[in-house]
């Protein structure tokens, strides 16, 4: 979703690597491979482990002894429940299985890069919305619910929608990622969020 949009927005700056290819082809690696929800915890735990950790380690191995910067797309949810006021220096306390594997990948990245002298950046992305042909209740939930509203279908809001969310439009997220790639310091963590929170029910009502 985000990776595809990034490629569409900056096609002349991107070398798209096939998913089954582990070799870096540029000196700036932008790593998007990831699950996107906590739903696999109810069906197959190995999906998150295999996708978020095993493949990730395979790619890291191919980056050894190469002059690259590894830019890892992580999630703001590694902070845990209090994500709206989180700073990059705050302690992480991930709660869901997805965010736990993302935090584990972050720690693997830092350890591996320090061991083998690889430069890195970690980008923690907030909730993202935008046009996506594959929206579902588990992926891009806001887009999914807006789609239901357009079809005049009922939607069920957990807790009445009385919880805060920080949403960014996918194009803005991609622009922010590009800024970090161009100007961000190496071996640093960057939060990418709007900085504005709203009740989820209010977002749906505005939609």
Language-model regions, residue ranges each:
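Conserved Rossmann-fold NAD(P)-dependent oxidoreductase catalytic core, especially the SDR/UDP-sugar
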Residues: 29, 57-97
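Active-site Tyr-X1-5-Lys
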Residues: 81, 93-121, 126, 149-151
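Glycine-rich NAD(P)-binding loop of the Rossmann-fold in SDR/ketoreductase-type enzymes
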Residues: 43-58, 92, 96, 100-103
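Glycine/proline-rich active-site loop of Rossmann-fold NAD(P)-dependent oxidoreductases
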Residues: 103, 116, 128-143, 153-154, ...
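N-terminal Rossmann/SDR dinucleotide-binding element
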Residues: 1-33, 37, 137
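NAD(P)H-binding glycine-rich loop region in Rossmannoid oxidoreductase-like domains
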Residues: 22-51, 62, 78
């Amino acid at each position: 979703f985000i990776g595809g949009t990034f490629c569409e927005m900056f096609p002349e700056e991107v070398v798209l690597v096939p998913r089954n290819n582990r070799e870096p082809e540029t000196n700036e690696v932008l790593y998007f491979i990831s699950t996107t929800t906590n739903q696999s915890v109810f069906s197959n735990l190995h999906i998150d482990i295999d996708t978020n950790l095993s493949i990730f380690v395979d790619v890291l191995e191919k980056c050894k002894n190469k002059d690259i910067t590894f830019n890892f797309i992580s999630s703001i949810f590694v902070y845990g429940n209090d994500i709206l006021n989180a700073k990059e220096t705050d302690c992480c306390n991930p709660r869901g299985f997805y965010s736990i594997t993302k935090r584990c990948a972050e720690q693997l990245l830092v350890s591996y890069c320090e061991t083998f002298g690889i430069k890195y950046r970690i980008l923690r992305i907030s909730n993202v919305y935008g046009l996506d042909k594959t929206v579902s209740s588990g992926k891009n939930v806001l887009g999914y619910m807006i789609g239901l509203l357009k079809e005049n279908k009922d939607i069920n809001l957990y807790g009445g929608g009385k919880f805060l969310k920080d949403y960014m439009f996918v194009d803005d997220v991609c622009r922010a990622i590009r800024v970090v790639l161009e100007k961000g310091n190496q071996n640093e963590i960057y939060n990418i969020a709007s900085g504005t929170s709203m009740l989820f029910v209010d977002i749906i009502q505005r939609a």
